[in-house]
Amino acid sequence: VVDQKSYNEAKTEIDAYRASVENEGLGTYLLIDEWKHPEPIREQLMQLHADKKAPLEGCVFIGDVPIAMVRDAHHLTSAFKMSPKADWKQSSVPSDRYYDDFDLKFNYIKQDSDIVDYHYVSLSPEGEQYIMPDIYSSRIRPIQVEGMDKYQQIRDYLKKVVAEKQSNNVLDQLT
């Protein structure tokens, strides 16, 4: 799952990473869009996971993919305890469980006015109240530092990942 701008800027490296995953015998999907809200991403992941012939096992979020800022779920965290009345950026939990745990139900609240990638969602009591992801997920999101090109960070990281996957690291070959 990648935003259009990040894909345009790091197409060669993203395609090389995709090929390295496929070389391990795994199928891949490439979901590219100008993501404005998290719901369409979650819906597509659920559809791909429900495919009986080739169910989705996991996903990687690359670049500027919306971040679900979960509210009303402090009981699911191990160490994060804060009054929900505090500033929402501080009292919400950024969590990709929004995308990978399909038994959790959420109600969309709003998009953050300052950080547009933040989308506040409330954990609904109608869904499960424990975490058991259906797929695995990871996120490749560059840090924002003045003078550093975030797309170069993505390119550099993916080059390292592909190089590591091509090395014969015996720890990756467990039997």
Which residues does each PLM region occupy?
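Cysteine-dependent hydrolase recognition
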Residues: V1-T175
